[in-house]
Amino acid sequence: MGRVIRTRPVSGDLDRVFRDVCENNGVKVASAQLNRIESVFHRLSAFPRLGRDRSDLRPGLRTFSVKPWQVLYRLNGEDVVILRILDGRMNLAAQLGKKT
């Protein structure tokens, strides 16, 4: 089992998830959502190819849904590198700055 490595933007993404969910559903639901996302990180370390291949957006990119959020990651050998946590209701290509 590889390590989970978080890139710098992930911390801000998790803060945004908490803030957005908290505004609409309260602290308890927001905390539960963060716990779900964190559990996905550990699951991906055990099963790194579990997510969907999204090389159409960026070479090597994979995504895993924690509705409505998308965990974007790539593999680096045995390690899982978490790149971003983005809103899956929005166009991922646009959020990544890719023209469609």
Swiss-Prot record:
Belongs to the RelE toxin family. The keyword Magnesium does not apply. Keywords: Toxin-antitoxin system. Pfam families: ParE_toxin (PF05016). Toxic component of a type II toxin-antitoxin (TA) system. Its toxic effect is neutralized by coexpression with cognate antitoxin ParD3 but no other ParD or RelB antitoxin. This is Toxin ParE3. Disruption phenotype: No visible phenotype when deleted singly or as the parDE3 operon. The keyword rRNA processing does not apply.
